[in-house]
């Protein structure tokens, strides 16, 4: 084995361990998979869902709990879709899988004008079909392949174009409460997944339902974030971390926090806000200062000088 091959193998092992560690941590943090679960892994044929299936299968062998994996792909009847690729790949893995056939292509093409983005309607139709199929096969969790970068991009998409502070949660109870959606790749970086897919040589199937048309808004957000990351390394991770530490009282949503019902309560001991240093710098106000009286007002120039000297 040459030195280059040895180094390449070492780098791949590090990458695989990092991805498995990130997926394992996300699963543990959000209790995504429990003992006895039947996890329906949605496989699109893209790099992310392939990686998700591969990593979950690896974790399944080492996990202290027992859970089943069922791979599901939705054949949307796009012209030229290579129907043989996924069945051949999944047969080689020896796992249970289903190909769900639904002609959403015709529906999307009949509703969306030529040249317009089809992603929104396509995803809604696909989601409805997959939710129903999950119930049919008794799946207790639906695993989707969205990663950390997808989540942050969605946050800014909703802010910039929808006026909502909303992203993609790592774990979600569907509106009708009949399905739980999990995103095991929530802590994974897209660049890692791209390299992993390249090294594993997954048989990638491009989405050509809309002629490989890019979602221009998402691409603009992606470029913006990449620019930030280049200038300020670690920026995307910091933004993602902020989604895990939300202070509802510091925002402005009256449904999320009861601003209207705020009242004063001075029965408890005053909280130390760390202003002892300010108390030491500023001399106490004269006793004559009360109400609208200005007799005890301090000279602002002297106060500023005192602060500067301190």
Curated annotation (Swiss-Prot):
GO terms for molecular function: 4 iron, 4 sulfur cluster binding; ATP binding; magnesium ion binding; sulfurtransferase activity; tRNA binding. Keywords: 4Fe-4S, ATP-binding, Cytoplasm, Iron, Iron-sulfur, Magnesium, Metal-binding, Nucleotide-binding, RNA-binding, Transferase, tRNA processing, tRNA-binding. Its cofactor is Mg(2+); [4Fe-4S] cluster. The keyword DNA-binding does not apply. One of its GO terms (cellular component) is cytoplasm. It is found in: Cytoplasm. Binds 1 [4Fe-4S] cluster per subunit. The cluster is chelated by three Cys residues, the fourth Fe has a free coordination site that may bind a sulfur atom transferred from the persulfide of IscS. InterPro entries: Rossmann-like_a/b/a_fold, TilS/TtcA_N, tRNA_Cyd_32_2_STrfase, tRNA_thiolation_TtcA_Ctu1. Pathway: tRNA modification. It is an enzyme of class 2 (transferase). The keyword Ribosomal protein does not apply. A motif (PP-loop motif) lies at residues 44-49. [4Fe-4S] cluster binds at residues 119, 122, 210. GO terms for biological process: tRNA thio-modification. Its EC number is 2.8.1.-. It catalyses: cytidine(32) in tRNA + S-sulfanyl-L-cysteinyl-[cysteine desulfurase] + AH2 + ATP = 2-thiocytidine(32) in tRNA + L-cysteinyl-[cysteine desulfurase] + A + AMP + diphosphate + H(+). Catalyzes the ATP-dependent 2-thiolation of cytidine in position 32 of tRNA, to form 2-thiocytidine (s(2)C32). The sulfur atoms are provided by the cysteine/cysteine desulfurase (IscS) system. Belongs to the TtcA family. The thiolation reaction likely consists of two steps: a first activation step by ATP to form an adenylated intermediate of the target base of tRNA, and a second nucleophilic substitution step of the sulfur (S) atom supplied by the hydrosulfide attached to the Fe-S cluster. Homodimer. This is tRNA-cytidine(32) 2-sulfurtransferase. It comes from Saccharophagus degradans (strain 2-40 / ATCC 43961 / DSM 17024).
């Amino acid at each position: 084995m040459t030195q280059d091959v040895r180094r390449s193998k070492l780098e791949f092992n590090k990458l695989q361990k990092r991805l498995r560690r990130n997926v394992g941590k996300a699963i543990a943090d959000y209790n995504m998979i429990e003992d006895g679960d039947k996890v329906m892994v949605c496989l699109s044929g893209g790099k992310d869902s392939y990686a998700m299936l591969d990593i979950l299968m690896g974790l399944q062998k080492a996990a202290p709990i027992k859970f089943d994996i069922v791979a599901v792909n939705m054949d949307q009847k796009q012209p030229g879709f290579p129907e043989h690729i996924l069945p051949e790949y999944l047969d080689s893995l020896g796992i249970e899988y289903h190909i769900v056939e639904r002609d959403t292509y015709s529906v999307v093409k009949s509703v969306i004008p030529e040249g317009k983005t089809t992603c929104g309607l396509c995803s809604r139709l696909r989601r409805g079909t997959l939710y129903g199929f999950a119930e049919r096969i008794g799946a207790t969790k639906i695993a989707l392949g969205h990663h950390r970068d997808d989540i942050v991009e969605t946050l800014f998409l909703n802010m910039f174009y929808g006026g909502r502070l909303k992203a993609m949660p790592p774990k979600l109870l569907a509106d009708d409460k009949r399905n739980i959606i999990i995103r095991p790749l929530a802590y994974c970086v897209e660049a890692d997944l791209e390299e992993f897919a390249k090294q594993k040589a997954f048989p990638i199937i491009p989405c050509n339902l809309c002629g490989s048309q890019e979602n221009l808004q998402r691409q603009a957000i992606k470029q913006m974030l990449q620019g930030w990351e280049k200038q300020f390394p670690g920026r995307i991770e910091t933004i993602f971390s902020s989604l895990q530490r939300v202070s509802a009282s510091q925002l402005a949503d009256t449904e999320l926090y009861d601003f209207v019902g705020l009242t004063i309560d001075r029965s408890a001991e005053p909280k130390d806000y760390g202003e002892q240093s300010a108390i030491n710098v500023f001399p106490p106000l004269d006793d004559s200062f009360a109400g609208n009286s200005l007799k005890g007002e301090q000279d602002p120039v002297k106060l500023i000088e005192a602060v500067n000297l301190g």
